Amino acid sequence: VAQKTVRWCTISNQEANKCSSFRENMSKAVKNGPLVSCVKKSSYLDCIKAIRDKEADAVTLDAGLVFEAGLAPYNLKPVVAEFYGQKDNPQTHYYAVAVVKKGSNFQWNQLQGKRSCHTGLGRSAGWIIPMGLLYDQLPEPRKPIEKAVASFFSSSCVPCADPVNFPKLCQQCAGKGAEKCACSNHEPYFGYAGAFNCLKEDAGDVAFVKHSTVLENLPDKADRDQYELLCRDNTRRPVDDYENCYLAQVPSHAVVARSVDGQEDSIWELLNQAQEHFGRDKSPDFQLFSSSHGKDLLFKDSANGFLKIPSKMDSSLYLGYQYVTALRNLREEISPDSSKNECKKVRWCAIGHEETQKCDAWSINSGGKIECVSAENTEDCIAKIVKGEADAMSLDGGYIYIAGKCGLVPVLAENYKTEGENCVNTPEKGYLAVAVVKKSSGPDLNWNNLKGKKSCHTAVDRTAGWNIPMGLLYNKINSCKFDQFFGEGCAPGSQRNSSLCALCIGSERAPGRECLANNHERYYGYTGAFRCLVEKGDVAFVKDQVVQQNTDGKNKDDWAKDLKQMDFELLCQNGAREPVDNAENCHLARAPNHAVVARDDKVTCVAEELLKQQAQFGRHVTDCSSSFCMFKSNTKDLLFRDDTQCLARVGKTTYESYLGADYITAVANLRKCSTSKLLEACTFHSAKNPRVETTT
């Protein structure tokens, strides 16, 4: 096999020199990994174009350029991130913060007329983030942005600004003569330390820096206590509490590649071997993370290593919603759609063809208050909401867990039992997850001997169909090999070649859609999993009402029209079997109701609009043939569960408190078995996931 070669793009003679010694040292050190070759261009933008045009394969970019590279026509994606800090707790981002002196009584929404200190024009923490987030408050016209900022603050020090055209942006700077406001250390208030000194020496009221700046400049805690952070929810917190009080997370520098045919595996293999041989303290011959010919060549000198970025992560998931919003606001041609407080419409995310049809009907009936965005599967929809391409959707608890890890929050819960006036103010305790079998199956089929049986699941990662039964099973067998435990099954969303796709039948109209986690697979969802039991399986993992909803003439489809409720039974955890209507005493676990999720900056808007929509198209509408009904679809649970009585307010909540500790534990056990690509991407920047964006 010919060795793969990764073509690295360089932007200066110094980088080209370091690259050629990288190339020589790698070919000596590594016998059969990928090789590196060097391509020279004159700027990052030229490198981005060269990678798109397949003249080069990789280059390291800062977060702002990762954003540019991800846009059309380049469409590059980040594939490897630099990390800073210790190996056992690698940091792949820093926090941009607003530092103020203790006792200066103003909040984030009262910055107008204050004096400001910035690291430099166009820099992430010092300019892009604070100005992008304050964009809505800036006076019109907002172009050029420097002019708007100059009239927003009373005076500033923004190194690199033009002192002739925007004298107020340089007024507070401390450089002498031509060096005042310079774009380098000749201006004493330049960079992180400079902007902090501008605040410290009382040339400004607020400094826009990164979370470590105060720690680095004031190692003594008593000195740090003289300062505070401004939080976006208009409170203040101590400077050490930056994880709960920051403006945005700025991800570290990343290596970008083409999204299609981008060599990402070779790039990772190359860099992973390179860090083994030439990383921190490895070899005197060549060092990846230091630059004898200059500073930050090819990689940042402060990096301590590389991490592979999950495949599902594109530039906007990597950069995060707050940072992308700030960048978008500041790009001249993209101004924000509407200011934060306006609520013109809710963009609903629909999965697959059937949901999209129902959503389109809803959109027309709502007079455009609901708009539809569609995706192929649930995870792609969640990703669209995270990125701000959609606003809301209703999810099963298993997906609420994933959405929560991605920073979304529950807004309204589906209620299934509560009817009438009070429904909207009383969220329920949850529904029951059960295991259903045919009564005709022998008595030896019970909860304790399911091995080798044929199983039917609503979908992988869903609550009643997967997380609860597989979580319980995992505790018993201590293994993730569920496909070897059951003989065959249909668990939509599994790997196509898995035995858990063997029973799936796909779509009537479009072959090749077997085992997809959407309505193209006829065995998908509650009704689908029950149909799988009826036609092929031994056990179905569903919710407690499914049998009642599809038997005794309630479902008119050919496969269901003659079914009787009495012909099915439930499996209890103690090994017994019970009639279907005794779920209260014979279930696997109580599952949290499905709920609508949104980004936290959209919570109020989504809740208000949906409560209006349900007042118009909710359960009280009797004739669904002539008017639109939110909670009706042909026994398919499209957009919402069909047995939803109303959407109920849940108050300000988090995904953890909504799902409850027991359920989180079940899912956390299964995390070891999880194949969710989105979950990998959303938890990449931090194992402990400090994405508590407080925007109200």
From Swiss-Prot:
Gene Ontology terms describing biological process: antibacterial humoral response; intracellular iron ion homeostasis; iron ion transport
Modified residue annotations for Dimethylated arginine: 23
Limits of the Transferrin-like domain: 6-332, 346-672
SUPFAM superfamilies per the UniProt record, alphabetical: Periplasmic binding protein-like II
Sequence positions that bind Fe(3+) 1: 62, 94, 192, 253
Localization annotation: Secreted
Positions with a binding annotation for hydrogencarbonate 2: 458, 462, 464-465
UniProt keyword list: Disulfide bond, Glycoprotein, Ion transport, Iron, Iron transport, Metal-binding, Methylation, Phosphoprotein, Repeat, Secreted, Transport
Keyword tRNA-binding among record annotations: no
Binding partners and assembly: Monomer. Part of a complex composed of SLC40A1/ferroportin, TF/transferrin and HEPH/hephaestin that transfers iron from cells to transferrin.
Alphabetized PANTHER family for the sequence: SEROTRANSFERRIN (PTHR11485:SF31), TRANSFERRIN (PTHR11485)
Protein name: Serotransferrin
